[in-house]
């Protein structure tokens, strides 16, 4: 029978390792502490932001365009372009290795006929014949000689509109630009001792690394960015490049101030934020063509990374705010594809990422000021999600993208199953990106944003790198931890998930077929078959079963078994000590605890109701211990639970133990049990109702509570799946034989299935009412 799962959990739920007990005790310990915050804090909330001051950055970023610098003579670094920006005609730059290469560059204005001009090159007056036939472009000309007393020859002219020129030392050569803008390219001159060549620039210049040569070529051909051409850009001396910058460390703990008991610490940290989105996709009832909701939900993610040689364990919670609700209605027919609501995040939305790690910075994050952060941006793209229809091509929601840009940081608290974590909440504003999203095989296309259908696009996580800085008030002794005001046993996040799961479970009650339920209730469900719908591997199922058993150990059902075991132990001791029949009768009634009740309470209508209600609450255990061939309430309860577990879309390893335990306690709260003696049936329910009647005629007879208590002790207890009122109604309207009546009284599953297959409305309504009682 399906109720085997409950008996198996009861049998095995006590095999919990001692280490698990110790860990659980430590995690559920609460502590209330009153703190005098001292002179640094006025409230127990985060103080006002006094300004972040300097936020050190541990990442050295080499600028693309470094400058401008004033005209000077120096030895440029190898593999760096000098981007020269002359304003007038004349000598632009000159350089030599004083051995076999003297190289200079001159600038000639537009529309110059062939003429001889005098230039000062390397301190000497030199006559050079020059010309520029272009009406609009300036002309750069290289003048080169190989001996100190030799003559200059002209090489590699560059016709330029932006009036920019470049020169670089690299790989035993001196590189320059030639050709005509906007299609200029590089050329070179071979030289020895190239790294010792000193350059003299006669105009402002910039320095660009070789890695950004494409950018340098873009400037040569098209000009500098507009901001570089304003009067607010002032050239500085090249010696400013020699200033030594202190490289910040990935981890910095700086003492800002201290008193006798407290100190202010500034924590600077490089961090790696990994996060992912979670979603909920709920299918509506009916023929399988309609979905009620596709929505975002908060997602927790735990990971490790290395920071300055130290392994850091981090925890993030990602949530969204300001979502946009869309819908699609393919028509009014039952087979038309419909999504009642699907959520999309766009430029009016925000993403919140709560970050915590196990470093010292988060250990005392209670009184904090001067909080600042600098984070990179990240793009999130949507994947393909197919809506599986029973027949026809599947609609596919595909595409969509947004970029996340840092928009601030505040203090926050993350809630996990056992603890609350003081953390940082990073707020991100969104901008929509290409491509747009669409639903293939529908009219929906060209919409921008990130839909909730598959926001992670098959990626395990998204990653953002950055750095934060804060000043925290902490105890002077590092061994002490700042007390927090609230308990650490906070389960809000788990309770929220359980609330959503309870709603889903309750809605699934309407989708259970009764004939299949009866068949499932007859199967011997064990832990592996019960949880096989969630995990496919045996190891995963075993781990999940262990978690369920740990939680089940604390259930009211397990506590009842423990109490019953103690009662039976006391009963056995009393039997061994006393030979009186009354003593045996009293102690043997440990199943019901009614011996004293029956003798102490006056037998009135109200007292009988109280007694039968008390007895009925204990009969579940008696029935489980004396299993019969008939079906019982726990068989139906377990079958409904199995069906809902297989259909659920929100169930996970964290919520499963809670759901299984709640189901064992709350499914079918109104139960009735009966005992049969010859032609008499005594039946009592947990709500205090009781009946005694004849099997042949269903005629009611006086109810004897003492007789009921004695029969409960000596006879099998049967679940009243079809209770007395239903049986009487069935007999009055349809008429049933004595054998059928006995089979229904014994809850024979074969007869129940026959009545259901015959679509008997009275039996169906009774079973449906039991299914609807399977609620959380």
UniProtKB/Swiss-Prot annotation:
Claim: Membrane is one of the keywords in the record: yes
Q: Mind telling me which residues the site (Binding to sialic acid) is annotated on?
A: 101, 190
Region ranges (Spike foot)? 510-776
The residue numbers the entry assigns to motif KID motif are 644-646
Q: DGE motif: where is this motif?
A: 308-310
Q: Which family does it belong to?
A: Belongs to the rotavirus VP4 family.
The protein's name is Outer capsid protein VP4
Question: Which species is listed as the source?
Answer: Rotavirus A (isolate RVA/Cow/South/Africa/Offal agent/1965/G8P6[1])
């Amino acid at each position: 029978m399906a109720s085997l799962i409950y008996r198996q959990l009861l049998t095995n739920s006590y095999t919990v390792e001692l280490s698990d007990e110790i860990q659980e005790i430590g995690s559920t310990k609460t502590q209330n502490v009153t703190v005098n915050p001292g002179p640094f804090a006025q409230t127990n909330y985060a103080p006002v932001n006094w300004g972040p001051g300097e936020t050190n950055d541990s990442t050295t970023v080499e600028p693309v365009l470094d400058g401008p610098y004033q005209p000077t003579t120096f030895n440029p670094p190898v593999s760096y372009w000098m981007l020269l920006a002359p304003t007038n005609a004349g000598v632009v730059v000159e350089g030599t290795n004083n051995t076999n290469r003297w190289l200079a560059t001159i600038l000639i204005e537009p529309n110059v006929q062939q003429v001889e001009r005098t230039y000062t090159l390397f301190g000497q007056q030199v006559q050079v014949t020059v010309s520029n036939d272009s009406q609009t472009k300036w002309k750069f000309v290289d003048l080169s000689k190989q001996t100190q007393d030799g003559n200059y020859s002209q090489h590699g002219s560059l016709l330029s509109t932006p009036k920019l020129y470049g020169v670089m030392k690299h790989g035993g050569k001196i590189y320059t630009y030639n050709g005509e803008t906007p299609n200029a390219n590089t050329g070179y001159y071979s030289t020895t001792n190239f790294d010792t060549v000193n350059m003299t620039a006669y105009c402002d210049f910039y320095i660009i690394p070789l890695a950004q040569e494409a950018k340098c070529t873009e400037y040569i051909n098209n000009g500098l960015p507009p901001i570089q051409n304003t009067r607010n850009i002032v050239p500085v001396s090249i010696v400013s490049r020699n200033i030594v910058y202190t490289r910040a460390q990935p981890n910095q703990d700086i003492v800002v101030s201290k008193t006798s008991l407290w100190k202010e610490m500034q924590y600077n940290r490089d961090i790696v934020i990994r996060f992912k989105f979670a979603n909920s996709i709920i299918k509506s009832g009916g023929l399988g063509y309609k979905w009620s909701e596709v929505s975002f939900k908060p997602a927790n993610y735990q990971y490790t990374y290395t920071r300055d040689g130290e392994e850091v364990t981090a925890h993030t919670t990602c949530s969204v705010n300001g979502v946009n609700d869309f819908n699609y209605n393919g028509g009014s027919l039952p087979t038309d594809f419909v999504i009642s609501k699907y959520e999309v995040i766009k430029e009016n939305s925000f993403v919140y990422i709560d970050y915590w790690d196990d470093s010292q910075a988060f250990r005392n994050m209670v009184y904090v000021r001067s909080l600042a952060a600098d984070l990179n941006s990240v793009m999130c793209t949507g994947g393909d999600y197919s809506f599986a229809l029973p027949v026809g091509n599947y609609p596919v929601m595909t595409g969509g993208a947004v970029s996340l840009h840092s928009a601030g940081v505040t203090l926050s608290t993350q809630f996990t199953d056992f603890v609350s974590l003081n953390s940082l909440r990073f707020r991100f504003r969104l901008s929509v990106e290409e491509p747009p999203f669409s639903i293939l095989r529908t009219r929906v296309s060209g919409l921008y944003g990130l839909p909730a259908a598959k926001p992670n696009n098959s990626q395990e996580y998204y990653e953002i790198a950055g750095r934060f800085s804060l000043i925290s008030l902490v105890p002077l002794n590092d061994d002490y931890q700042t007390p927090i005001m609230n308990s650490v046993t906070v389960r809000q996040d788990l309770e929220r998930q359980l609330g959503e799961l309870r709603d889903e479970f309750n809605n699934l009650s309407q989708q259970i077929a009764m004939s299949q339920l009866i068949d499932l209730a007859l199967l011997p469900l064990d832990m592996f078959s019960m949880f096989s719908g969630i995990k496919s591997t045996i190891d995963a199922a075993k781990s999940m079963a262990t978690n369920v058993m740990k939680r089940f150990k604390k259930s009211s059902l397990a506590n009842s078994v423990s109490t019953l075991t103690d009662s039976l132990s006391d009963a056995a001791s009393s039997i061994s000590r006393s030979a009186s029949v009354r003593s045996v009768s009293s102690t043997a009634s440990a199943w019901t605890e009614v011996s004293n009740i029956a003798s102490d309470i006056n037998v009135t209508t109200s007292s009988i109701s109280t007694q039968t209600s008390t007895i009925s609450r204990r009969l579940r255990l008696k029935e489980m211990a004396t299993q019969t061939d008939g079906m019982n309430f726990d068989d139906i309860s377990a079958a409904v639970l199995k069906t809902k577990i297989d259909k659920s879309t929100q169930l996970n390893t964290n919520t499963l133990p809670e759901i299984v335990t709640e189901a064992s306690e709350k499914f079918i709260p109104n139960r009735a049990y009966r005992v049969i003696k010859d032609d008499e049936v005594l039946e009592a329910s947990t709500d205090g109702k009781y009946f005694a009647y004849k099997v042949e005629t269903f005629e009611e007879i006086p109810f004897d509570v003492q007789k009921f208590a004695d029969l409960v002790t000596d006879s099998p207890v049967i679940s009243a799946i079809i209770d007395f009122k239903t049986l009487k109604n069935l007999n009055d309207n349809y008429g049933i034989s004595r054998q059928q009546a006995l089979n229904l009284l014994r809850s024979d599953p074969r007869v129940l299935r026959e009545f259901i297959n015959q679509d008997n409305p009275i039996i169906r309504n009774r079973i449906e009412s039991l299914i609807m009682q399977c609620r959380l």
